[in-house]
């Protein structure tokens, strides 16, 4: 059995790490490189960086900080933000990232997933899904351009259908960003995770809602996700990664303990 992963998420805007609630009202958390170093030292298994306005701004992620991060940490990291071509991905991987993640650009052009997977291998290609639970229809809807409150919009994709589609196209890993739970720290959407786990045959990462160590445990135990991504509980030092992993190990979760 592969070890479960704890993955701090760093949303980047204007060169700094920020954090919002339900993808809105972002506050500045701090500088990118020191935070990356801190999480690596605490025992994170990998890091994910989202340049949250790159796609809506029509640009690719700023590569200068990617290179700086690669110099100071020794764990894998994934970068997302406006990657629309094989050339964009090549630059980010050349600057030191281990994986690239695409979200809105994949919705605009699903063939991008296949082209990237063919060039770099599926192990390098992560697809992020921003998913919103609509209470009226009792369904999960995929959203696009969520880094910009003015441009955020629902797509025609139901989350379950998009999960199936991107696997066919070559996604090597899926990060499910559950927008209703984002930043509110009341737990991952286990119902949604269980539904998607049943149809997901590549590594599935839960994102959105972690507030306590038990929330991580529930995601691993009850939804069998491969990794749990979180931001505010780590940024605000509510949960220490080393202590979290010790707790999870004590509860029988297969995890790399620092």
Swiss-Prot record:
Q: What is a biological process (GO) this protein takes part in? A: L-histidine biosynthetic process
In this protein, the active site sits at 11, 130
**How does this protein assemble?**
Heterodimer of HisH and HisF.
Disulfide linkages recorded for this protein, renumbered to the chain, are: none
Pfam families reported in the protein's UniProt record = His_biosynth
Q: Where in the cell is it found?
A: Cytoplasm
What biological function has been recorded for the protein in this entry?
A: IGPS catalyzes the conversion of PRFAR and glutamine to IGP, AICAR and glutamate. The HisF subunit catalyzes the cyclization activity that produces IGP and AICAR from PRFAR using the ammonia provided by the HisH subunit.
What is the name of the protein in this document?
A: Imidazole glycerol phosphate synthase subunit HisF
Query: What metabolic or biological pathway is this protein involved in?
Result: Amino-acid biosynthesis; L-histidine biosynthesis; L-histidine from 5-phospho-alpha-D-ribose 1-diphosphate: step 5/9
* SUPFAM superfamilies the UniProt entry points to: Ribulose-phoshate binding barrel (SSF51366)
Q: What is its EC number?
A: 4.3.2.10
Q: Which family does it belong to?
A: Belongs to the HisA/HisF family.
Q: Which NCBIfam families match?
A: hisF (TIGR00735)
Chief localization class? cytoplasm
| Catalytic reaction list | 5-[(5-phospho-1-deoxy-D-ribulos-1-ylimino)methylamino]-1-(5-phospho-beta-D-ribosyl)imidazole-4-carboxamide + L-glutamine = D-erythro-1-(imidazol-4-yl)glycerol 3-phosphate + 5-amino-1-(5-phospho-beta-D-ribosyl)imidazole-4-carboxamide + L-glutamate + H(+)
**Example of a GO cellular component annotation carried by this entry:** cytoplasm
The record's listing under InterPro entries reads: Aldolase_TIM, His_biosynth, HisF, IGPS_HisA/HisF, RibuloseP-bd_barrel
Q: What class of enzyme is it?
A: lyase
| Presence of the UniProt keyword Cytoplasm in the record | yes
The species this protein was found in: Yersinia pseudotuberculosis serotype O:3 (strain YPIII)
Q: Keyword annotations for this protein?
A: Amino-acid biosynthesis, Cytoplasm, Histidine biosynthesis, Lyase
Q: Which domain of life is it from?
A: Bacteria
User: MF terms per GO, please?
Assistant: imidazoleglycerol-phosphate synthase activity; lyase activity
């Amino acid at each position: 059995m592969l070890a479960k992963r704890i993955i701090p998420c760093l949303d980047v805007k204007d060169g700094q790490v920020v954090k919002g609630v339900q993808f809105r009202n972002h506050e500045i958390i701090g500088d990118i490189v020191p935070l990356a170093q801190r999480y690596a030292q605490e025992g994170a298994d990998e890091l994910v960086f989202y340049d949250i306005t790159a796609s809506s701004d029509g640009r690719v992620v700023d590569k200068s900080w990617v290179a700086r991060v690669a110099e100071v940490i020794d764990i894998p990291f994934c970068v997302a933000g406006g990657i629309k071509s094989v050339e964009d991905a090549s630059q980010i991987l050349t600057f030191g990232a281990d994986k690239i993640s695409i979200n809105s650009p994949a919705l605009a052009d699903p063939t991008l997933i296949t082209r990237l997977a063919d060039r770099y291998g599926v192990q390098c290609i992560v697809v992020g899904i921003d998913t919103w639970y609509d209470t009226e229809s009792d369904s999960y809807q995929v959203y696009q351009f969520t880094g910009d409150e003015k441009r955020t919009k629902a797509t025609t994709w139901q989350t379950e259908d998009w999960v199936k589609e991107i696997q066919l196209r070559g996604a090597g890993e899926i990060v499910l960003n559950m927008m209703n739970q984002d930043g509110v720290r009341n737990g991952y959407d286990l119902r949604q995770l269980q539904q998607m786990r049943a149809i997901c045959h590549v590594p599935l990462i839960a994102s959105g809602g972690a507030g306590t160590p038990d929330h991580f445990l529930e995601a691993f135990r009850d939804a069998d996700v491969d990794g749990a991504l979180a931001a505010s509980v780590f940024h605000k030092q509510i949960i220490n990664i080393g202590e979290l992993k010790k707790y999870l190990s004590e509860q029988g979760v297969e995890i790399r303990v620092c």
